Amino acid sequence: MIKLFIDTNVVLDTILPGRPFADSSAAVLRMGGDSCRMYLSSMSVATLYYVAEKIVGKDDARAVVSEWFRKNYVLPVSDICVYDALRSDCPDFEDAMQIACADYGDCDCIITNNVKDFRSYAPLPVFSPEEFLAGCYAASARRIEYLSSLPDARSIDDVVD
């Protein structure tokens, strides 16, 4: 199972009107399930609540955060994350905290709309939502092509057996 660390801006794209990456961000957030788990930092949850409260009010903001908890996971910003962020060369402290949290949480990659800054400092792969979706599509296409090339294989069960 792949562990995706979702940067704050990806979630905000789905609740703020007129954001340029809203569609791809929403598509990534719908992917959670058996094949991948999505994680936010506790710092992102606070930001998400704050922004949602300004847009939809206190009760609905709580519903937005509750919806995230229903399907996904939250990583704490620990003292280790803060220490790592302080030692980082990353000039943006918030980005450094997110990177440290993703690394400490043993995530496989970071999904952000700020790939330029994150890629320079993150010790793990960084993708924009569009890049991640394109990679998933390409992997699915290769799998379908492979399965269809097998003689008389009608399903994955035929291959596994």
Residue ranges and their predicted role:
Residues 10, 44, 81, 98, ...:
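Alpha-helix capping/helix-boundary segments
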Residues 51, 56-78:
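Helix-adjacent hinge/juxtasegments
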Residues 75-77, 126-129:
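Short acidic-hydrophobic, aromatic-tinged amphipathic segments that line or gate anion-handling sites
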Residues 74-116, 159-161:
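Active-site neighborhoods of divalent-metal-dependent phosphate/nucleic-acid chemistry enzymes
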Residues 1-40, 55-60, 120, 137-161:
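Short, well-structured N-terminal submotif of metal-dependent ribonuclease cores
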Residues 70, 106, 121-122:
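Short, structured coil segments at secondary-structure junctions
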Residues 116-124:
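Short loop/helix-cap segments at secondary-structure boundaries that form the rim of catalytic
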